[in-house]
Curated annotation (Swiss-Prot):
Residues 347-369 have a biased composition (Basic and acidic residues). InterPro entries: AIM24, AIM24_sf, Trp_RNA-bd_attenuator-like_dom. Residues 341-377 are annotated as: Disordered. Pfam families: AIM24. Residues 1-32 form a transit peptide. Keywords: Mitochondrion, Transit peptide. One of its GO terms (cellular component) is mitochondrial inner membrane. GO terms for biological process: inner mitochondrial membrane organization. This is Altered inheritance of mitochondria protein 24, mitochondrial. It comes from Coccidioides posadasii (strain C735). The lineage of its organism: Eukaryota, Fungi, Dikarya, Ascomycota, Pezizomycotina. Disulfide bonds: none annotated. The keyword DNA-binding does not apply.
């Protein structure tokens, strides 16, 4: 399957069907840089390294060799078409962490293999509804293991980290296996204006990482200054840079009315009856039910209007089959994105910059006093006073 490319153009060229092909009509318009979207993994070397993922093609048959990513102590190779098996080659004393129940087979000296069940931060991961049961496999001699998942519509992507760029795994069940003594995987939770970091895993260090996605996994490479908007349920992972993903909603056609502000809310809250009603348990329970129904409607009915905007330089991995919006965003994140003004993404950044400008020390003020000259007064014997101006001042 050839790589898909989204072409960003300034204009639109109509096409006509002629001789079995679509041919453009009219003059050629100027083009901008193409934001390439390539499937991963593939036959050619398309390691997701610190900066880019080269264009690649997919295998043409089941027997075609898969992608092989080699590090110092291990190698990951994706097999099958579609990519349904992960072959892991481990050297001696190298640890492999894989999700429980994903080990298919193993070759090598089985008497030297040690497999233990590890609980990776069970309290935090359970609170975030993330898998925390992983199998640690190590051997005193080199071995080769096969890893797969139960889902029939899942494909693999291999990420190689060199220690210069960190990755964020957004989907809760996307993290499959990893290896590397210097590789660290930690669940993250941003208690402030978090976007897709609820239930995410931050990966730092150096090593190999295997992620799974529903359907086919594609890579989107953004250069500095480029932007890309993606649905949060389709985002599998992305590189961490100074520009965090921001909420985005497309503008919708709506009829707006200008209603004068009469201050009825302030007048009504002056009533003791309404204030006591707002403090009652019945009113609080009713408002909780209302907010729950509103969040459910935003997730179920208007969930396709919630997007995230990425800004380059960055690499984003997306999956062709989207997961549920509830698996990517929490109730608080859905309400935050839905409450943002459509088409506005830099409001929070401008607010922070304005606060920093206010906190900066004010420049020194000029008191307005300036020496314009100097005179010397002398008193004569007859009582007269003479003023003499001093030159050079």
């Amino acid at each position: 399957m050839e790589p898909m490319n989204y072409l960003v153009r300034r204009g639109f060229r109509p096409s006509a069907w002629k001789y079995g092909k679509w041919r453009p009509i009219g003059k050629t318009v100027s083009e901008r840089r193409r934001i390439s979207i390539q499937p991963v993994p593939s036959v050619e070397s398309n390691t997701v390294n610190a900066s880019y993922l080269p264009a690649a093609s997919t295998p043409s048959s089941v027997t075609s060799p898969g992608l092989c990513i080699v590090s110092n102590d291990a190698s990951f190779e994706v097999l099958g078409s579609p990519y349904s098996l992960l072959s892991v080659s481990l050297s001696a004393s190298q640890n492999l962490y894989t999700r429980r129940g994903t080990l298919v087979g193993l070759t090598g000296k089985s008497e030297n293999v040690v497999s233990t069940l590890r609980l990776l931060e069970p309290l935090r991961r359970a609170a975030l509804r993330m898998p925390f049961l992983y199998q640690k496999i190590s051997s005193a001699s080199p071995v080769n293991a096969l890893i797969s998942v139960r889902s029939p519509i899942t494909s693999f992507a291999v990420v190689q980290l060199d220690g210069t760029v960190d990755w964020m795994i957004t989907q809760r069940d996307a993290l499959l296996s990893w290896t590397g003594h210097a590789l660290t995987v930690k669940p993250t939770l941003n208690r402030e204006l978090s976007l897709v970091h609820w239930g995410s895993s931050k990966v730092t260090g150096r090593g190999l990482l295997a992620v799974v996605g529903k359907g086919q996994v594609y890579s989107i490479n953004l250069r500095a200054g480029e932007r890309y908007i993606a649905h949060p349920s389709n985002v599998v992972a992305y590189t961490i840079n100074s520009h965090w993903p921001r909420p985005f909603r497309f503008k919708s056609t709506s009829l707006k009315f200008q209603i004068p502000k009469l201050g009825l809310g302030t007048l009504l809250m002056k009533s003791n009856f309404l204030r006591n009603l707002a403090d009652s348990d019945t009113w609080k329970a009713t408002m909780r039910i209302f907010h729950t129904v509103r969040t459910w409607a935003r997730r179920t009915i208007w969930g396709d209007r919630l997007f995230l905007q990425f800004e380059g330089p960055a690499t984003v991995l997306i999956q062709s089959r989207a997961s549920r919006i509830a698996e990517s965003l929490t109730a608080r994140e859905v309400n935050e994105i839905a409450s943002t003004q459509p088409g506005v993404t830099r409001e929070a950044t401008e607010t922070v910059e304005a606060r920093l400008e206010k906190q900066s020390p004010p420049p020194a003020k000029d008191d307005g006093m300036k020496t314009v000259g100097q005179s010397v007064a002398s008193v004569r014997r007859d009582g007269k006073v003479e003023f003499e101006k001093v030159d050079g001042v």
